[in-house]
């Protein structure tokens, strides 16, 4: 058993965490050719259906240097091609209610505990405004459109507000008047609420774990990691696909990142947003430097090794962190991305994203859910 002390938590307390020591890891080969061969063998194992162990994933985290990380990315891209194909899932989001959030997530500028500078504050948008943006997203090439709201979630909202029913009605309008698929990210929901969303037409729901179970208490104290897991399980019970990922660059360790990916694998989520922290002024994490581009690529590649068939989605921070190198993520395991603007920050024009995909020989559309692509290719082979 080992003991270490986390930095200050969301509640301002110091937490001593007890963890079992990880198994000893064999360092990856240092010779370039040996590393390339080793990664080819490992990636083929994953393609053949093996699961990467935590020890193996931690070994991948030891790969350093830009050239070696690019070799890791190439191996992850082989897994993506074999398990997911070349269609990149495109979605867009709308912030339907913003600011004054009761939760104290240290990365978020919408929290009432530390309202970020220039963070918008407004109540629930009208169905007409949301529908208009859904239609615009469809024209821009998005296949899914997610309604995102601040707050802990409908599970804790007053029924008298009527907001949940208004969301359900807006979802029905979107399914009736467009061909885009509506998703939601409203926070925690009960099983009954998840079933109501499913009946209204929601097929996928975003509810991120944000970080590993061990690191979560360092960034949020107003609710628990287990609360978020409970909502993911409610969604799956209701027959809604779980779009569940996290944020890289909040001060977490490589082991935290590996643990998050393994938790997502155990939950059997369908889509995994990979957010790259874009530090916002006025938030407790606003002082952090942006994640190194090659650390971001390494994280993406390791997630692909651990989640070979899941939809891995470029999400918030893509442009801000990756800059002109963002196309490398699409050759490192990514097979989905948000297009258009984010919740409180701007994205690049959708036409730029389409041009980037075309230049890489990829096609925007709707990516297969886990297992679907391999089933299709196996049928064709027979």
UniProtKB/Swiss-Prot annotation:
Organism of derivation: Crocosphaera subtropica (strain ATCC 51142 / BH68) (Cyanothece sp. (strain ATCC 51142))
UniProt keyword Isomerase present: no
Reactions catalysed, as given in the entry: (4R,5S)-dethiobiotin + (sulfur carrier)-SH + 2 reduced [2Fe-2S]-[ferredoxin] + 2 S-adenosyl-L-methionine = (sulfur carrier)-H + biotin + 2 5'-deoxyadenosine + 2 L-methionine + 2 oxidized [2Fe-2S]-[ferredoxin]
UniProt-listed SUPFAM superfamilies: Radical SAM enzymes
Subunit (UniProt): Homodimer.
Family that this chain belongs to: Belongs to the radical SAM superfamily. Biotin synthase family.
Enzyme class per UniProt: transferase
Domain Radical SAM core: 83-318
UniProt KW Nuclease keyword: no
Pfam families to which the protein is assigned, alphabetical: BATS, Radical_SAM
Cofactor binding note: Binds 1 [4Fe-4S] cluster. The cluster is coordinated with 3 cysteines and an exchangeable S-adenosyl-L-methionine. Binds 1 [2Fe-2S] cluster. The cluster is coordinated with 3 cysteines and 1 arginine.
Enzyme Commission number(s) from the entry: 2.8.1.6
GO molecular function, one term: biotin synthase activity
Gene: bioB
Keyword field: 2Fe-2S, 4Fe-4S, Biotin biosynthesis, Iron, Iron-sulfur, Metal-binding, S-adenosyl-L-methionine, Transferase
PROSITE patterns the UniProt entry points to: RADICAL_SAM
Superkingdom of this protein's organism: Bacteria
Descriptive protein name: Biotin synthase
Needed cofactors: [4Fe-4S] cluster; [2Fe-2S] cluster
GO biological process, any: biotin biosynthetic process
Entry binding sites for [2Fe-2S] cluster: 146, 183, 243, 313
């Amino acid at each position: 058993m080992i003991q270490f002390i986390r930095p200050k938590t969301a509640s301002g307390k110091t937490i001593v965490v007890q963890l079992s020591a990880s198994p000893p890891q064999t360092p990856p080969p240092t010779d370039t050719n040996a590393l390339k061969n080793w990664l080819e063998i490992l990636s083929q194992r994953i393609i053949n259906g093996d699961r990467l162990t935590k020890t193996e994933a931690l070994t991948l985290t030891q790969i350093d240097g830009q050239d070696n990380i690019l070799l890791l990315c190439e191996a992850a891209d082989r897994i993506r091609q074999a398990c997911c194909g070349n269609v990149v899932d495109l979605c867009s989001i709308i912030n339907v209610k913003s600011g004054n959030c009761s939760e104290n997530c240290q990365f978020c500028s919408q929290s009432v505990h530390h309202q970020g500078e220039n963070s918008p504050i407004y109540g629930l948008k009208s169905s007409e405004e949301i529908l208009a943006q859904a239609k615009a997203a469809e024209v821009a090439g998005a296949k899914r459109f997610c309604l995102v709201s601040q707050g802990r979630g409908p599970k804790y909202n007053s029924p008298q507000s009527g907001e949940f029913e208004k969301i359900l009605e807006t979802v029905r309008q979107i399914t009736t008047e467009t061909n885009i698929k509506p998703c939601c990210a409203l926070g925690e929901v009960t099983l009954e609420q998840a079933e109501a969303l499913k009946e209204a037409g929601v097929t996928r729901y975003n509810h991120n774990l944000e970080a590993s179970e061990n690191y979560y208490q360092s960034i949020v104290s107003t609710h628990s990691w287990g609360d978020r897991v409970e909502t993911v399980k409610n969604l799956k019970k209701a027959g809604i696909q779980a779009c569940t990922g996290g944020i890289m660059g909040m001060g977490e360790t490589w082991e935290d990142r590996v643990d998050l990916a393994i938790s997502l694998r155990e939950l059997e989520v369908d889509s995994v947003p990979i957010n790259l922290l874009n530090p916002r002024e006025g938030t407790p994490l606003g002082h952090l430097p942006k994640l190194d581009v090659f650390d971001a690529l390494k994280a993406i590649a390791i997630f692909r090794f651990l989640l070979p068939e899941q939809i891995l989605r470029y999400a918030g921070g893509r442009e801000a962190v990756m800059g002109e190198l963002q196309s490398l993520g699409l050759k490192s395991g990514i097979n989905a991305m948000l297009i258009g603007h984010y919740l409180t920050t701007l994205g690049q024009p959708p036409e730029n994203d389409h041009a980037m995909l075309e230049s890489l020989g990829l096609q925007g559309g709707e990516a297969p859910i886990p297992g679907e692509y391999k089933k299709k290719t196996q049928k064709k082979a027979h």
